[in-house]
Amino acid sequence: MAGRTITRADLCEAVYQQVGLSRTESAALVEMVLREIADCLAKGETVKLSSFGSFVVRDKGQRVGRNPKTGEEVPIEPRRVMVFKPSSILKNRINGRTGKAAGRE
């Protein structure tokens, strides 16, 4: 059940339609928000958006992986990964649950 992909341009248009800023101002606003989120994540900070979810940066240590074709062991370097943890409100909305029943999980 794949839906449509929303792009930056779509977000800018939505801000333009709903907030009443000019298209240029709407695009600048969306870019500022996305840049701020990216800058915070690059510094290793968690970005929590109430009723939406949290973007969390995690450090993964070095480990040994395996080449699936040859079976040879390959070292995987330490790295940082970003994960998104949706809020329970967003999870309920995605699953079509609303109201009091949604809050009882």
Swiss-Prot record:
GO molecular function: DNA binding; structural constituent of chromatin
Record GO biological process: DNA recombination; positive regulation of metabolic process; regulation of DNA-templated transcription; regulation of translation
Record key words, sorted: DNA recombination, DNA-binding, Transcription, Transcription regulation, Translation regulation
GO cellular component: cytosol
Role, per record: This protein is one of the two subunits of integration host factor, a specific DNA-binding protein that functions in genetic recombination as well as in transcriptional and translational control.
Record-linked PANTHER family: DNA-BINDING PROTEIN HU, INTEGRATION HOST FACTOR SUBUNIT ALPHA
Assembly mode: Heterodimer of an alpha and a beta chain.
Similarity-based family: Belongs to the bacterial histone-like protein family.
Name of the molecule in the record: Integration host factor subunit alpha
Name of the gene: ihfA
